Structure formats: C-alpha cells, structure tokens
A protein has these predicted regions:
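Non-catalytic alpha/beta scaffold blocks inside enzyme catalytic domains
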Residues: 1-128
Length: 128
C-alpha cells in the first residue's frame, strides 16, 4: 500500500495510519474462504447474482452455504437471493430519482417513472 495515500486517508478520517486495513483479497479468494476458520462469516451480496454469474458456481454455492449470515440486496428474488438469510428489496432504476453517467462521461438526470413497491429502499439508503 502507498504510504502517502494511507497518510492522506488517515488524516481525513482522523485515525492512525496503522489502524487502516490493508489491501483486500480478490473476490475468488474471498468466496473460497467463506465460512471457514479465519474466513468471511457474513456477506452482503449487492447488485449481483453470483449463483449465476460466478465461475465454478457449485463451489460458490457451497461456500456461501457455510456462512453464518448471507444478506442479498436485489430488486427481484434471484437465485442468490433465494438462498439468503435476509433479502433487502432495492429500487429499480425507474423507481428512483437521481443522476447517472453514461459511457461517454455525460451526467444525465433520471426522473422516477413509477412508484416503488412498499418496503423497497434505495441502495444508498441501505448502505447508509
């Protein structure tokens, strides 16, 4: 890790640079450690259906099955959400106001097109 970057971040947050976490691990390693001693015990899957999109899906299913807690935030009951201990319903793009940046780098305003179902929350609300 870059010491200058760590010093900058620690100054902004008012913490000792040594208290900042180190580099993370690749997603494949993270999933392989799920539910094992010293590994991840709980996981929030956000915006992904890993039971369909991850390589070696059977291994991923087994790994997530070892977790103490699996939380999935999604706007429909995906294969991954079906296996979750908790499913947090999120808004679809047409159900929220905001902005987006397209592939050209243009910032576009998005207006709500339809009302969201009761109980659904924005992903920002869930993360906060």
């Amino acid at each position: 890790a870059d010491p200058a970057a760590r010093a900058s971040v620690s100054a902004v947050w008012g913490v000792d640079p040594d208290d900042l976490p180190g580099p993370g691990v690749p997603a494949v390693e993270l999933l392989q450690s799920a539910g094992l001693p010293g590994g991840v015990r709980a996981l929030l899957v956000h915006g992904s259906n890993v039971f369909v999109s991850a390589p070696n899906v059977q291994t991923v299913r087994e790994a997530l099955g070892r977790l103490d807690l699996l939380v999935v935030s999604d706007f429909f009951l995906s294969e991954t959400a079906e296996a979750a201990d908790i499913v947090l319903p999120v808004l679809q793009w047409a159900e929220e106001e905001g902005t987006m940046t397209n592939l050209e780098g243009r910032v576009l305003r998005r207006r709500r097109a339809v009302e969201a179902p009761a109980g659904a929350r924005s992903e920002l609300w869930i993360m906060a």
